[in-house]
């Protein structure tokens, strides 16, 4: 009975060691995955458009007005929240938005389909790396569109 918990502990420890060892991409055999990890995921430099998008986020956070939309948990009920609260709760975080920007910049996407934009900040991150992109953003709730 005592051997099983030790085996699980050793297994978790080895998985943790592998995660730490290969975190920066070293030890990954695939050149594609190595470049993706080192040049996209682990890159820390700030790009030119991040400042503009975060300035727009701050403007939306302090914007007056409320939006009434259907509640996800309680079917049939409606919620009323301020625009700032919706941006704070539902929009993409700056860290994840920067990752979206770096991914689209790395793959040089020309056509982008986004489902569920919620105020459009993630759409800005996806499309701000170049001009002349074709982006189709679908939003289920007309209040957020």
Where do the PLM segments sit?
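A short alpha-helical cap/connector motif
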Residues: 1-145
């Amino acid at each position: 009975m005592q051997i099983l918990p030790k085996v699980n502990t050793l297994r978790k420890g080895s998985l943790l060691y592998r995660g730490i060892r290969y975190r920066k991409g070293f030890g990954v055999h695939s050149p594609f995955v190595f470049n993706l990890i080192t040049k996209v995921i682990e890159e820390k430099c700030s790009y030119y458009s991040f400042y503009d998008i975060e300035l727009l986020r701050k403007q939306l956070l302090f914007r007056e007005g409320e939006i009434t939309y259907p509640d996800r948990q309680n079917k049939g009920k409606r919620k009323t929240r301020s625009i700032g609260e919706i941006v704070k709760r539902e929009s993409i975080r700056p860290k994840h938005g920067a990752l979206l920007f770096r991914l689209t910049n790395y793959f040089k996407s020309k056509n982008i389909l986004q489902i569920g934009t919620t105020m459009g900040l993630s759409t800005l991150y996806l499309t701000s790396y170049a001009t002349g992109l074709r982006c189709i953003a679908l939003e289920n709730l007309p209040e957020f569109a």
